[in-house]
């Protein structure tokens, strides 16, 4: 009976493939869907509110006012910790703006307290001790008179900037947003229960000293129960929520209910916490030293200007201020009235899985719920595939073994397609790296379509197309073979989803979404018998795949927008094209994995593969032309970090064994100095890796933990003319005493110098650092922290010398011979410090597509 039915069905709906010329239209349909839906929604921003509209739109964020303040901030120029601009002018500016808010505040409803915090302290920051002296924060507490809540909501951002950068996007944008949010709260009749603390952080770029000063020492910090951290890795656009918690899923519920323009994903959180993104934020300080749970949000658009002199007012749109302001204002009002704030610990259990859909709505659920969903849809997909295969045996003359065998072949082809879909883009990245052609997409990001996406799509479809073309005639209809390809992809995704779930990765939700819509399509096809009616099942599949296609193309477009600018500052050791290739490959697999095998519905599918290969070839030719040169002046710059260094090495007897000058390069991207060689004379440039075995810290004044981590990949360009350092860094031995027992000696020092200094310590053979006046964390964990030790020191408004002592133990107790090396670096990072004439000329000789973050530095090495 079943065979009779199928014979009639096949008679009415023969399995004839469609003409080949429809295949390009099929693929172009999905491309058109991306540009018609995803691209506009990704770039959608709200209409900004003007000051003269405030009376008709009470309680709304006014972007025009925030923009005016941002322009004033921009005109002030760089704000470097230790400079008068940051420590005096900016503090006065912030206090003036805060007083303007107080002047408009509803005095009958609210109280405002303002405090300028000056603090000194230290903590372990990655591989160094991060010390600070007299750094400043401007702190405001806004509270409702009728409330007696002792649970505060903390909102943090920073106004200091990187050397050479005005910092209008990072993070002046967030500072003015906070000021306008404060104004709207203070002038509104809509009160809030929990006091709100606005922390205008004056030392974030140090790194992360102002936040530590607040959370470890400020009088209000013990009452801060939740956090909204605001930062930026770009200038303008939509801010992304990329970290939450840890735990405390109630915060995600408030974001879902309050955020008018949601933009968030669990995947971003896991990528950031894995260290793939070369950045850090104050969120970690509040999390680790509070601990204060919260939400970490950052601007991400136009990361090309981040930490450069082109981070200016003119690249930030007013509507981007409106977007962030509306989200922040609504979120603050929601959390400011949250019942959970009374006892946050009672609501702390469980991580969240969270994401937005095209910025239209936000989804979150508990990690435990996510585990259940992932397992259910993973197993459900496998079960439905088994039902479909059984159904095929009922409508053909084949037994279950034959159908299972055919499906087994399809599954092997699926594994091959996955390997190719990942492998071909990665292979492209490797080839381009071998030819010194990395970052060709850096300015013209559309090049990734031909370089990485098309090869991935070819990999997805090639094994199946070859099999369908070359296989002998089979009793299994072609339409069933195509369904088996989708089934194989479903089973593969189900296995991956379950494995990632077991591994504790919440990003497994991506595979669950893909399975959800395929399971839906398969259910419809089974219940309606469309799977047995020629190719009609593919229409249901395409309709059900529209939603996941939109989501995955939106998500991975967002990741490319965020990550492509970061490839120019990921360092020299890792090929950045690998990251972009993997993102393109994973996005292609998830967005198109069920769709592109359907080109085999059309005749001559190998022509479609040839067309994709031709597109790849054309894009390759374009990429090796001038179009593929990564850098452009002002908009897509090459970052070159270098110091103008004067070095002096003292031996144990006080003699000088080395005194020289040169340029110390901490190169930021994979192309090294090659793009500069046409304009700059690099004769004598040496790789420092060879010096690292002979000299402590490779003999250079690496700035912070990132510079020190990359020191073996650094370059040194000797200079005949001595570098003129605009100041003096002095280390003075105050006293040397032998302690009781005779095997330990104490050395007491005084260090004087600029606002940024580093101390490097290396005990010699047979000597152990027993104690010191710094934090003991390094000494208490010798398995983690090994010599040479790095102590980073910065001061804000107090340049007083620091005094410290070192206690060293020696096996033979002989302290009349060399015991340890100590290196002292002084960094004059501010733009107000004068560069000598040769350095100025060197900077001017750099190509116009270069942004140089540079400053003079001294490095003195002593042996005691």
Give the ranges of each region predicted by the language model:
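Soluble extramembrane regions of membrane proteins in the secretory/endomembrane system
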Residues: 48-364, 765-766, 771-810
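Ser/Thr/Pro/Gly-rich low-complexity linker/stalk segments immediately outside membranes or between
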Residues: 41-61, 631-639
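Alpha-helical transmembrane segments of integral membrane proteins
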Residues: 3, 25-40, 377-705
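Extracytosolic and intramembrane catalytic regions of membrane-associated proteins
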Residues: 92-129, 133-139, 175-176, 257-260, ...
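C-terminal domain-closing interface element
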Residues: 218, 222-240, 372-395
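Start-transfer (signal-anchor) and selected internal transmembrane alpha helices
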Residues: 11-33
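Short, low-complexity, Lys/Arg-enriched N-terminal segments of secretory-pathway carbohydrate enzymes
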Residues: 1-14
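Cytosolic-side membrane-insertion boundary helix
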Residues: 346-382, 397-407
């Amino acid at each position: 009976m079943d065979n009779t039915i199928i014979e009639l069905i096949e008679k009415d709906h023969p399995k004839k493939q469609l003409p080949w010329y429809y295949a390009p239209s099929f693929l172009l349909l999905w491309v058109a869907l991306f540009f018609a839906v995803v691209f506009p929604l990704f770039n959608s921003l709200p209409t900004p509110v003007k000051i003269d509209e405030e009376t008709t739109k009470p309680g709304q964020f006014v972007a025009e006012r925030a923009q005016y303040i941002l322009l004033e901030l921009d005109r002030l120029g760089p704000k470097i910790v230790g400079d008068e601009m940051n420590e005096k002018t900016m503090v006065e500016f912030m206090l003036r703006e805060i007083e303007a808010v107080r002047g408009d505040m509803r005095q009958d409803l609210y109280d405002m307290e303002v405090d300028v915090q000056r603090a000194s302290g230290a903590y372990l920051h990655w591989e160094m001790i991060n010390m600070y002296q007299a750094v400043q924060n401007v702190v405001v507490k806004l509270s409702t008179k009728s409330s007696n809540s002792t649970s505060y909501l903390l909102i943090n951002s920073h106004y200091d900037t990187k050397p050479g950068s005005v910092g209008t996007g990072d993070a002046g944008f967030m500072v003015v947003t906070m000021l306008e949010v404060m104004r709207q709260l203070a002038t509104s009749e809509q009160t809030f229960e929990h006091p709100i603390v606005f922390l205008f952080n004056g030392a974030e770029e140090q790194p992360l000293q102002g936040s530590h000063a607040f959370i470890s020492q400020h009088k209000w910090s013990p009452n801060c129960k939740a956090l909204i951290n605001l930062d930026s890795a770009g200038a303008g656009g939509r801010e992304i929520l990329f970290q939450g918690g840890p735990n405390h899923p109630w915060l995600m519920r408030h974001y879902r209910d309050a955020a008018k323009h949601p933009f968030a994903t669990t995947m971003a959180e896991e990528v950031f916490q894995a260290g793939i993104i070369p950045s850090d934020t104050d969120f970690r300080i509040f999390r680790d030293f509070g601990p204060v749970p919260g939400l970490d949000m950052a601007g991400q658009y136009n990361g090309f200007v981040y930490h450069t002199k082109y981070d200016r007012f003119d690249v930030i749109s007013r509507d981007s201020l409106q977007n962030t302001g509306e989200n922040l204002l609504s979120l603050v009002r929601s959390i400011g009235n949250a019942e959970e704030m009374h006892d946050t610990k009672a609501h702390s259990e469980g991580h969240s899985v969270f994401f937005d859909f095209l910025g239209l709505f936000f989804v979150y659920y508990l990690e435990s719920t996510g585990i259940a969903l992932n397992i259910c849809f993973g197993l459900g997909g496998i079960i439905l595939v088994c039902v479909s295969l059984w159904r095929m045996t009922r409508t053909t003359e084949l037994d279950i073994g034959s159908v299972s065998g055919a499906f087994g072949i399809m599954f092997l082809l699926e594994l091959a397609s996955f390997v190719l879909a990942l492998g071909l883009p990665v292979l492209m990245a490797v080839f381009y790296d071998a030819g010194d052609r990395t970052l060709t997409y850096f300015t013209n990001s559309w090049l990734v379509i031909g370089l990485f996406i098309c090869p991935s799509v070819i990999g997805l479809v090639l094994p199946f197309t070859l099999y369908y073309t070359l296989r002998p005639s089979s009793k299994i209809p072609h339409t069933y073979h195509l369904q088996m390809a989708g089934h194989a992809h479903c089973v593969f995704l189900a296995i991956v989803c379950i494995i990632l779930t077991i591994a504790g990765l919440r990003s497994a939700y991506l595979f669950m979404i893909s399975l959800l819509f395929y399971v839906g399509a398969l259910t419809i096809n089974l219940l309606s018998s469309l799977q047995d009616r020629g190719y009609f099942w593919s229409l249901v599949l395409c309709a059900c795949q529209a939603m996941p296609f939109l989501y995955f193309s939106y998500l991975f477009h967002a990741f490319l927008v965020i990550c492509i600018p970061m490839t120019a500052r990921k360092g020299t050791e890792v090929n950045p094209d690998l990251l972009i290739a993997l993102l393109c490959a994973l996005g292609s697999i998830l967005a198109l994995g069920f769709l592109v095998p359907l080109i085999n519905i059309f005749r001559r599918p190998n022509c479609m593969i040839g067309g994709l290969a031709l597109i790849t070839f054309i894009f390759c030719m374009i990429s090796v032309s001038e179009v593929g040169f990564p850098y452009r002046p002002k908009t897509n710059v090459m970052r070159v970090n270098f110091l103008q260094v004067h070095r002096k090495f003292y031996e144990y007897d006080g003699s000088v064994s080395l005194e020289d000058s040169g340029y110390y390069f901490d190169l930021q991207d994979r192309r090294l100095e090659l793009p500069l060689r046409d304009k700059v004379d690099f004769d004598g440039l040496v790789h420092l890796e060879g010096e690292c075995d002979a000299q402590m810290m490779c003999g250079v004044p690496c700035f912070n933990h990132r510079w020190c981590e990359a020191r073996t990949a650094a370059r040194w360009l000797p200079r005949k003319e001595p570098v003129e350092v605009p100041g003096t860094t002095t280390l003075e031995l105050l006293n040397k005493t032998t302690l009781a027992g005779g095997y330990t000696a104490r050395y007491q020092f005084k260090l004087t110098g600029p606002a940024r200094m580093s101390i490097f310590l290396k005990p010699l053979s047979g000597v152990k650092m027993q104690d010191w006046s710094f934090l003991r964390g390094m000494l208490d964990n010798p398995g983690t922290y090994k010599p040479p030790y790095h102590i980073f020191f910065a001061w804000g408004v107090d340049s007083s010398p620091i005094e410290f002592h070192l206690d060293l133990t020696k096996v033979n107790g002989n302290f009349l011979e060399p015991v340890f090396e100590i290196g002292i670096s002084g960094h004059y990072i501010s733009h107000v410090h004068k560069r000598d004439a040769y350095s100025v000329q060197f900077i001017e000789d750099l190509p116009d597509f270069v942004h140089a973050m540079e400053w003079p530095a001294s490095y003195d090495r002593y042996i005691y």
